């Protein structure tokens, strides 16, 4: 089982969109997937069509100080999987969600306590028999919840957009990962940068992608992700991009499948 955190320093770069695109690719490939929505805004939960019962959210698990295996008590099945099973006749598909909620914000302090960092790691104990992939959607900051996610993860993907401010933010994120490893007992085995919302015809965007390539080299994940309106329509309908019609949707879906293949082919 591979555990991957999707991080960003600020909102607006499409962090949750990247998480949803990877989940869509995993669903189509038949990869048994669990989504842990640590973002108090719960955009990934909404995008996956999940309406969780009251009290059934990841904040409840964190409040138990990371009881071993506790995440199983709050997971629900995404309608994406239910629909795919019905329409494609694939009864063995697995896509579960540990829903996000504003309750998680109680733990998202700027200054973290070392005793808090293992909460999610412990809550995930034992789920490796149920899933091949865990995607953690982090809050758009570098506070406690993001570091709780890093402590539980094998890999971290930092989402950037091709802008001056995002390039600087990505540098700070990668520096923070290195500092996290030096200052705690946890090690992130792999980190990468995904470039989202790229306008292929924009010289400014081309320049920023080249700048990111220069800064991060092999850590820059290929391919980049274009900013097509069809992706917004698919998300608005809470629909997997791999099942949305049209050439633009197919192109985006193919790129997410490539990124997922790279993630799963590397050792955790």
PLM feature segments, named:
Residues 1-268:
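P-loop NTP-binding core
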